[in-house]
Design a protein with these regions (language model features):
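Juxtamembrane helix-loop-helix junctions in multi-pass membrane proteins
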Residues: 17-48, 105-109, 174-198, 213, ...
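C-terminal-most transmembrane helix of multi-pass membrane proteins
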Residues: 43, 55-59, 221-223, 231, ...
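Hydrophobic transmembrane alpha-helices of multi-pass small-molecule transport proteins
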Residues: 50, 132-152, 172, 203, ...
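Specific transmembrane alpha-helical segments of multi-pass solute transporters/efflux pumps
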Residues: 22-23, 57-113, 149, 229-247
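Glycine-/small-residue-enriched transmembrane alpha-helix faces in small-molecule transporters
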Residues: 1-37, 41, 87-88, 92, ...
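C-terminal transmembrane-helix exit sites in multi-pass transporters
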Residues: 49, 53-54, 117-138, 261-280
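Transmembrane alpha-helical segments that form core, pore/gating elements
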Residues: 46-50, 120-122, 127, 157-211, ...
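Helix-helix packing/entry segments at the starts of transmembrane helices
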Residues: 16, 39-41, 110-116, 179-200, ...
């Protein structure tokens, strides 16, 4: 497997693993601080963590590209626009997700509705003339079926909070497609850092408007906040951006949806939750979808 192919497969799987295991840390914060406070804090931590990485990397990097003043200006403009677009989509998606949970949607259904971006990404991609192969569409359907088995425990009926989560899924799909556009022009780590900067600003403004600033509550969640800030955001989302460079966004999305599988497994190992037969089947179906999405089928040759 070539280096680029390794990056396009391993990075999103690692991101999915980090996000799946981060649910434990998020649950620890949910009862202590509000959604906007949680997001503003974790995104701010991610900015600081990535700034350190950028400073160290740029300090030791020897083969820096030589750009003219005009080229630097154009590159910086693309970077800031990309950071703003990615950060806005991320902030809206994550805050709508938390609002849906606060409105009463259970975590399992929230996970399923949020992960519907697996379907929305290829559908939206059609409007940008991005072709999706038949095997990849089958993999998308399989992944949705797997998510249903993993996340939905009882009857599926729509509640008010579910509409907020549908908006969340739409925004995550937009987030993935915006990343797909800007990774062609921007440094992945710097783009990730700027998206967190704008997401932190948007969440902080909402926090000061809708939630009281409770420093003791924030400090009581210091360890889980550091985990989600550094690993879930700083590492996980940066891996997503690096994986999407020159990749098929639909295939990367299917790999990222492994988050639900890792969340179930983490719950079984860390929280000692019992996995049902239904969840085992869901894991198998999801892995089948991932394998199918990675198989390179030969294209049919047109008749002469």
């Amino acid at each position: 497997m070539k280096h680029n192919q390794m990056r396009q497969v391993v990075f999103p799987i690692l991101a999915a693993f980090i996000w799946g295991t981060a649910f434990v840390a998020q649950d620890m914060c949910a009862d202590a601080i509000g959604a906007f406070t949680f997001n503003a804090t974790r995104y701010s931590i991610a900015v600081l963590a990535l700034l350190v990485v950028i400073l160290i990397r740029d300090g030791v990097k020897k083969d820096k590209p030589v750009l003219s003043a005009e080229e630097k200006k154009a590159a910086n403009r693309q970077l800031w626009i990309g950071g703003l677009c990615c950060g806005a989509a991320l902030a809206i998606a994550s805050n709508f997700q938390q609002a849906g949970l606060v409105a009463g949607t259970d975590a399992g259904k929230a996970g399923f509705i949020t992960a519907l971006y697996v379907v929305l990404v290829p559908v939206f991609g059609l409007f940008f003339k991005r072709k999706v192969s038949v095997p990849t569409w089958i993999a998308v359907v399989l992944s949705v079926a797997a998510l249903y088995l993993l996340c939905i425990k009882g009857d599926f009926s729509l509640a008010p909070g579910d509409l907020l989560l549908l908006v969340c899924a739409l925004c995550f799909a937009v987030h993935i497609l915006v990343i797909d556009h800007f990774t062609a022009y921007c440094d992945g780590v710097k783009l990730s850092c700027l998206q967190f900067l704008f997401a932190a600003i948007i969440s902080a403004v909402c926090m000061f408007i809708f939630e009281p600033l409770d420093m003791p509550a924030i400090l009581s969640c210091a360890l889980p906040l550091l985990y989600v800030g550094i690993f879930s955001c700083g590492v996980g989302y940066t891996l997503q951006i690096l994986a999407q460079k020159d990749s098929n966004p639909t295939v990367v999305t299917i790999l990222l949806s492994l988050e639900s599988v890792f969340a179930v497994i983490a719950g079984a190992i860390i929280l000692k939750q019992q996995m049902s037969i239904r969840e085992y089947i869901g894991c198998v179906v999801m892995f089948a979808a991932v394998v199918l999405a990675q198989i390179q089928f030969p294209e049919k040759k047109k008749a002469a």
